[in-house]
Amino acid sequence: MPIGVPKVPFRSPGEEDASWVDIYNRLYRERLLFLGQEVDSEISNQLIGLMIYLSIEDDTQDLYLFINSPGGWVIPGVALYDTMQFVQPDVHTICMGSAASMGSFILVGGEITKRLAFPHARVMIHQPAGSFSEVATGEFILEVGELLKLRETLTRVYVQRTGKPVWVVSEDMERDVFMSATEAQAYGIVDLVAVE
């Protein structure tokens, strides 16, 4: 029997009685954000809106983004990454479960020294993919060109934020490279591994 999203009591400052709000709403008020699905425009826009709102509300308190994502669409993921760099508060990224593909790109985008993985987390990097079925030749060439630009952008960010040489990141992005939490730390995707 599905129970839906759990509700928890929350008392707004100055109010006597607590009201019941869904757990994510309560956690957002504590500046705790969650990416627990495939990255698409909807979740990306929701997280971007929350980051901007919380940044306007108080730009001195850090934000915490918990990630358990199989990856997803490149453009919405890059938009989320750019927002993380844009907002004034530091964004801590925490990998729990897995951060694959675009999930690992968002993970590496956290404030350097404030990127963490749980001990049994898994991280995977690879190159962006496109779908070229039933595409005319001219469009195919344009799409390949755009895909190469996106790959170049992602590679540049991984190089900048991990400290790895371009040739290492480029070679690793040629295929799916899976890493444990400690391997992701050695690679420079995260800075810390939580203690068991």
Curated annotation (Swiss-Prot):
One of its GO terms (cellular component) is chloroplast stroma. This is ATP-dependent Clp protease proteolytic subunit. Cleaves peptides in various proteins in a process that requires ATP hydrolysis. Has a chymotrypsin-like activity. Plays a major role in the degradation of misfolded proteins. Keywords: Chloroplast, Hydrolase, Plastid, Protease, Serine protease. The keyword Hydrolase applies. The active site is at S101 (nucleophile), H126. Component of the chloroplastic Clp protease core complex. One of its GO terms (molecular function) is serine-type endopeptidase activity. It is an enzyme of class 3 (hydrolase). It comes from the Eukaryota. Pfam families: CLP_protease (PF00574). One of its GO terms (biological process) is proteolysis. The gene is clpP.
